[in-house]
């Protein structure tokens, strides 16, 4: 009895010391910090921080980054654990994701009811926690603990109605944090919920990604087999679309005849590419597209930033315009301004057509549409970022100085459905491209409406090189 009294006195004494220390800290130490923060220098710093906070990543930025990783993962068929370890589509990098990053991805996917892939990310976070990678003090302070990861795993597995594994996850959480009252209460609630769970209770179903798979085709990696007829295509020196090309022909790679798709080489000099990129960096804004109501909007299916430049905006755009006219044989007076576009990590443009008119409206009221698309690549992309044509199974990876060009319309002036294309997600690096669309109106004598693209005597455009 005496020993118990002595022990109780010691505990009370220890508790008293703790309380006193805490009260002193909150009174004396905090007043000292308050006096320090009230100094003019600190007030200036706080005001500066308020302004800087507006430039810091916001909640929407984190959402966009998480969506970019999700789409990239789905497109290239990567496993969550591989991404966390820095193994991206067959290439190992000297970078990894921390447990807190994996947990953030898991929670993002949970908010979308994507339980299967969310489970993958939480498990990747648990494995990342076990890795011996050096973690910064901030990571260690912020967590998450292993108990928090297992707790989240239990929630995901319950939503998947994997009850047995959900209970095991909570048991593992309690093993790592046995005194956590919240986890214990959730575990008890889960056990009671299991007893009352009705078989007819609806499950929050995962979204159907079939449509997204069509919009982000599986061949963005370039590993799909090309059709036999495309393997027989060839490269030529184009010296027929402009007199100057007899002296300096352009290396032209024919990727498809119908629709007509080519790759022009050595079309941009390093100086021109650097000038366009530097002129754009302070002006680019989130890319807009035209919706069904014919209004501009920032759409989720296109994650990039862009800015428009007139053809005569600077010396580089003037030279590119002239060079493009010579290479294609088309009249650049009837073309749109340049659009400089930057795609960051995971940057994507889902499958789409570049034309805006329906075939029944194409020859009415003098409407103008995009006859051809030209895409200048301003840098090499370390991984990802290809342009893919699902209908042709052609994948073109960015290479500095090349220009991808194709006709959106048949020779009779109607939409060619196999010109649907995708800007595949960037895995590593950043992609800089310049688009220039060439109008159909004004090209009547360069590329007239014909019944067949083989009627060579009427053509003066780039298609002459295949005849």
Question: Each PLM stretch: what is its role?
Answer:
Residues 1-405, 409-467:
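Fe(II)/2-oxoglutarate oxygenase catalytic core
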């Amino acid at each position: 009895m005496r020993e118990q009294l002595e022990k109780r006195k010691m505990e009370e004494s220890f508790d008293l010391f703790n309380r006193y220390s805490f009260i002193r800290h909150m009174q004396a130490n905090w007043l000292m910090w308050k006096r320090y923060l009230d100094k003019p220098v600190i007030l200036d710093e706080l005001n500066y921080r308020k302004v800087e906070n507006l430039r810091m990543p916001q909640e929407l930025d984190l959402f966009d980054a998480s969506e970019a990783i999700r789409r990239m993962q789905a497109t290239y068929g990567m496993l969550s654990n591989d991404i966390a370890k820095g193994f991206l589509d067959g290439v190992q990098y000297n970078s990894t994701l921390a447990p807190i990053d994996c947990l953030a991805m898991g929670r993002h996917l949970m908010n979308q009811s994507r339980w299967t892939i969310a489970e993958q990310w939480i498990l990747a976070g648990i494995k990342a926690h076990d890795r011996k990678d050096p973690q910064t003090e901030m990571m260690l302070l912020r967590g998450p603990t292993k108990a928090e990861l297992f707790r989240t795993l239990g929630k995901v597995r319950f939503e998947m109605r994997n009850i047995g594994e959900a209970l095991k996850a909570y048991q593992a959480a309690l093993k790592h944090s046995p005194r956590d009252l919240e986890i214990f209460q959730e575990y008890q609630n889960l056990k009671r919920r299991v007893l009352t769970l009705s078989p007819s209770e609806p499950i929050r179903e995962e979204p159907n990604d079939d449509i997204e798979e069509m919009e982000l085709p599986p061949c963005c990696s370039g590993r799909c087999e090309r059709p036999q007829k495309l393997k027989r295509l060839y490269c030529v020196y184009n010296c027929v679309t402009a007199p100057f090309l007899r002296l300096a022909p352009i290396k032209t790679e024919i990727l498809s005849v119908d629709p007509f798709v080519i790759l022009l080489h050595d079309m941009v000099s390093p100086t021109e590419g650097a000038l366009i990129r530097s002129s754009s960096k302070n002006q680019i804004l989130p890319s807009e597209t035209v919706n069904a109501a014919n209004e501009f909007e920032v759409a989720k299916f296109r994650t990039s930033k862009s800015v428009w430049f007139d053809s005569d905006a600077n010396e580089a755009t003037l030279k590119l315009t002239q060079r493009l006219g010579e290479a294609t044989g088309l009249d650049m007076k009837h073309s749109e301004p340049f659009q400089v576009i930057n795609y960051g990590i995971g940057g994507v443009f889902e499958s789409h057509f570049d034309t805006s008119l329906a075939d029944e409206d194409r020859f009415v009221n003098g409407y103008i549409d995009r006859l051809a698309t030209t895409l200048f690549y301003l840098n090499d992309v370390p991984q990802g970022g290809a342009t893919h044509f699902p209908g042709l199974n052609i994948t073109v990876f960015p290479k500095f100085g090349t220009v991808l060009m194709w006709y959106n319309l048949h020779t009779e002036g109607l939409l060619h459905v196999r010109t649907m294309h995708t800007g595949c997600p960037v895995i590593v690096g950043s992609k800089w491209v310049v688009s220039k669309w060439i109008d159909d109106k004004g090209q009547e004598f360069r590329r007239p409406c014909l019944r067949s693209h083989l009627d060579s005597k009427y053509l003066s455009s780039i298609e002459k090189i295949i005849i």
